[in-house]
């Protein structure tokens, strides 16, 4: 078992066979509305312009698609991480995974002066996997009495890796690039710069296919093994999928903090922790959350644009503190 912690962090399972319920359909409609608002939000007014339609398909459509795919990826990564570690406070931001992916990007730039997007993604994915496995191995060797210790350990590990990245950046005069990676923004997304995000769809399908095994892994090593699941193999597989999702997002977008913490916890409050039935909910709410934050980032100080990571960090911090302080009673959506 990766960690033994207080009951607050333990998964709670409910049977939800129906996906297309009234609340889920309403959630999809809300996300579609947010997507439409995103398509027509920006400094450049595409209406009535000669090149309006061209700009619409070159910049607005790719940005909105990137928002949807990225929101689903990071929320999904947080959900799988929380199941594997049996801790509700774990996600790529609180495990150091994002910092490891940034370190991977730095090493790619050190090896290849002008790396391609594929090379950047490969470096980010490999380092994300290594960093996440180091975090998981540490949890397996240390008995923790409180669930709160787990994210603290992850944040400390992330701080160390961030310091290493900063040192290497200063040493090789790459501090500006590092600052860019640590700030997630969709401002530069356009045709030709986001297409690899479609790989997230494959990751989502794989997670859905292995959802039952990942859910059993969330019960702990002893229970999962007794039910015929190869615990170590499924944890390794889940970690690989998380690393692919986080690595792609890090290379294309940058750091998007707390999204994997906010969404899975909101969903689990109402639906428990069954991965197969929760995955559509997590993806949809993840899409809506990041799209709403991006719309705010584009309009709050218009005509200027804030990095969406700043909005996410602010919202995520409030939600994180609320989760720590609130005694939650799961309710079921009907």
Swiss-Prot record:
Q: Could you name the Gene Ontology cellular component terms for this entry?
A: plasma membrane
Enumerate the transmembrane spans.
Answer: 24-44, 64-84, 98-118, 119-139, 152-172, 197-217, 234-254, 277-297, 304-324
Name the gene for this chain: fatD
Species? Bacillus anthracis
Q: What happens when the gene is disrupted?
A: A mutant lacking both fpuB and fatCD permeases is incapable of using petrobactin as an iron source and exhibits attenuated virulence in a murine model of inhalational anthrax infection.
Role summary: Part of an ABC transporter complex involved in ferric-petrobactin uptake. Probably responsible for the translocation of the substrate across the membrane.
Protein name in the entry: Petrobactin import system permease protein FatD
Q: Which keywords annotate this record?
A: Cell membrane, Ion transport, Iron, Iron transport, Membrane, Transmembrane, Transmembrane helix, Transport
Subunit notes for this chain? The complex is composed of two ATP-binding proteins (FatE), two transmembrane proteins (FatC and FatD) and a solute-binding protein (FpuA).
Checking SUPFAM superfamilies in the record gives: ABC transporter involved in vitamin B12 uptake, BtuC
By sequence similarity, the record places it as follows:
Belongs to the binding-protein-dependent transport system permease family. FecCD subfamily.
Gene Ontology BP, a term = siderophore-dependent iron import into cell
Q: What is its main location?
A: membrane
């Amino acid at each position: 078992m990766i960690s033994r912690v207080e009951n607050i962090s333990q998964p709670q399972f409910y049977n939800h066979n129906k996906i297309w319920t009234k609340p889920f359909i309403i959630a999809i409609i809300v996300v579609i509305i947010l997507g439409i608002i995103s398509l027509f939000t920006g400094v450049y007014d595409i209406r009535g312009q000669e090149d309006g339609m061209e700009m619409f398909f070159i910049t607005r459509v790719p940005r909105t698609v990137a928002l949807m795919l990225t929101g689903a990826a990071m929320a999904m990564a947080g959900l799988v991480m929380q199941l594997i570690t049996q801790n509700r406070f774990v996600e790529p931001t609180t495990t150091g995974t994002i910092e490891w992916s940034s370190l991977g990007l730095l090493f790619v730039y050190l090896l290849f002066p002008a790396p391609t997007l594929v090379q950047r993604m490969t470096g980010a994915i490999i380092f994300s996997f290594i960093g996440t496995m180091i975090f998981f191995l540490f949890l397996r060797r240390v008995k923790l009495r409180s669930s709160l210790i787990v994210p603290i350990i992850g944040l400390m590990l992330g701080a160390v890796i961030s310091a290493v990245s900063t040192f290497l950046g200063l040493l090789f005069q790459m501090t500006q690039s590092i600052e860019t990676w640590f700030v997630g923004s969709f401002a530069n997304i356009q045709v030709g710069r986001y297409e690899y995000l479609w790989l997230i769809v494959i990751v989502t399908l794989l997670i859905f296919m292995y959802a039952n095994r990942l859910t059993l892994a969330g019960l702990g090593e002893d229970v999962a093994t007794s039910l015929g699941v190869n615990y170590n193999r499924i944890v390794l597989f889940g970690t690989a999928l998380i690393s692919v999702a986080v690595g792609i997002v890090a290379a294309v977008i940058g750091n998007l903090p707390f999204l994997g913490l906010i969404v899975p916890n909101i969903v689990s409050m109402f639906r428990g922790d069954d991965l197969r039935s929760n995955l559509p909910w997590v993806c949809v709410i993840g899409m809506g959350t990041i799209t709403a934050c991006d719309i705010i980032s584009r309009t709050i100080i218009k005509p200027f644009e804030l990095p969406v990571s700043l909005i996410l960090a602010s919202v995520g911090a409030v939600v994180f503190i609320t989760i720590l302080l609130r005694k939650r009673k799961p309710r079921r959506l009907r």
